[in-house]
Amino acid sequence: MEHTTVTVNKTPARTRLLRALCVVLAILIFLAVPAVLSPVLEPKYLTQSKEGSLTEEYYASVAETTHDVLFIGDCEVFESFIPAILWEEYGITSYVRGGAQQLVWHSYYMLADALRYETPKAVVFNVYALKYGEPQKEEYNRMALDGMEWSSVKAEAIRASMTRDEYFIDYVFPLLRFHSRWSELTWDDLRYAYGDKPLVSDSGYLMQTGILPADTQAEFTPELLIDYTLPATAMEYLDKMRRLCEERGIELILIKAPTNFWRYHWYDEWDEQVAAYADANGLAYYNLIPEASEIGLDMSTDTYDAGAHLNVYGAEKLTRYFGGILRDTHEIPDQRTSGNASAVWQERVNAYYDRKTAMEAETKP
């Protein structure tokens, strides 16, 4: 008679359990290390490149109160429009979702992200970034996207924004990108790794109190371009922004800030294309360059970098001027009779003037 030999697993149940626990522990450690170290190694953007803090500061603001107007765009919005002044002068609630060289797809996803939390009455988009049809630099992507809360919107924004040398996984696990910052760490990196950082902006407005006059006597000839056609990709994202606003019942307003520095020249040919797009789609478009005198801008006192961008004194003038347009033409309501909004915004106005006083003391000659 043949006998069948049966092999019995003699590994004790306790040993198998310990092995399973070790595997689970290893996985937890693998996941915990990035979670613990990434907040330490990620740039804090508190003293240098403050623009990198702008994206994340929005969430605390919208948790307090919603906004009737969102400004979207590059430095021509976050250094030009002051929500505290809009409130003080007109009772308009607003926020600036801008960033350094914020390209059109960045702005589209900034808007889509904001609409997860609120539905403003109007979105004001600055059109200068329409000149760009491709991702530019990783550092600008990082400043725009690292502070965005995780969602499908952020995932799509990363894919749309990455340069050829970037990888999606580096955004999921920032430790992979910033591991070499060990030698650059400061006390702020440890102090603010897991706690709230001080605000660098006033509702998205990044203040500049310095004064460096523009050379108004100098003549310059803009660089001639081979092709003045605005890139198709940029216009596609502008149209996506328009459709998104339309779906949510939001008015989209296009603007060009009044600065027109030689290095960042706004060509008439570009302006004509934007005006034609606005006309074809029933949008308001304000090119504020010709309105500089009416706004009251004096580029001997209202710029901090020789005419490229406005300082706080120029931004206050522009905000008061454009606030009148928002009130009179676009019927954005005065919310100063709203008790909750008034309390929140009075704190923001006070914080704005406190920052202005402190910064003026630092920049006095």
Predicted regions and their residues:
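Catalytic nucleophile-elbow at a beta strand-turn-alpha helix junction centered on a G-D-S/GDSL motif
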Residues: 63-81, 309-312
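C-terminal regions of proteins
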Residues: 268, 272-346, 350-365
